[in-house]
């Protein structure tokens, strides 16, 4: 019996096994191996090659059709700054590598990418029991230009979590923003969410600090998106519209959202500028505090008194803790 040796050399394997990709900084002149890059950078470089290949195929195809490019969740393994840069630079990069206009569809769950995009180019998709709801933010902007200008500026400067939340809680200020999450956890421990299967702490809700003066501007927007919302705001009692007052002596409110809400409940025209009576605010029923999927809450009387703000209401129901005497009723 004779033994033979067959050598199999494949040029593809030789190149793959013996070649190392490096990155060189033009100014420093220092080369680093690709292993020094994170997965986010590697994915970004891979996408660059895929896009270049896609562009080349379009040039060779010579068809009259508009080429479509779908990029699904590019934020995977990218840090926020990289997501922002990628979303902003994508169209510029495509215009550099191709003379043909490429219509791009980019799907994402990233608030950073949504924050980079022009609102008129955003299409909101929501899965419901009846199917997928698809909404054009550009259409909302045309119908509500004033609201859209404010929402666009606010979300751009703060956060776009609203697009990816199952529900949203709008709060008055920093106190509510800090206390509400803790209150939700304590309510859960006390069993106040029972018998709900998926309790609020396990749901994806967005907590957005917006202030009582502007929360009403978001109401048409969340109604358009179909997102349930809760507004927690201050009653802000006033004597005559200019002078602050304790609730028991107040005549109206300075809170624009509450005034907007009462006008909606009473069916008053938007042009109506008459003062909203504090009595009408206090007497709102639970049903009247709900419009579609939006609900509003503010301070109510406890221990014979009604606080003007959340801070006053907390002190009122914890008088012993704060060393306050019992209220005179």
What are these regions (language model features)?
Residues 155-170, 174-329:
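Acidic, Mg2+-coordinating catalytic modules of nucleic-acid enzymes
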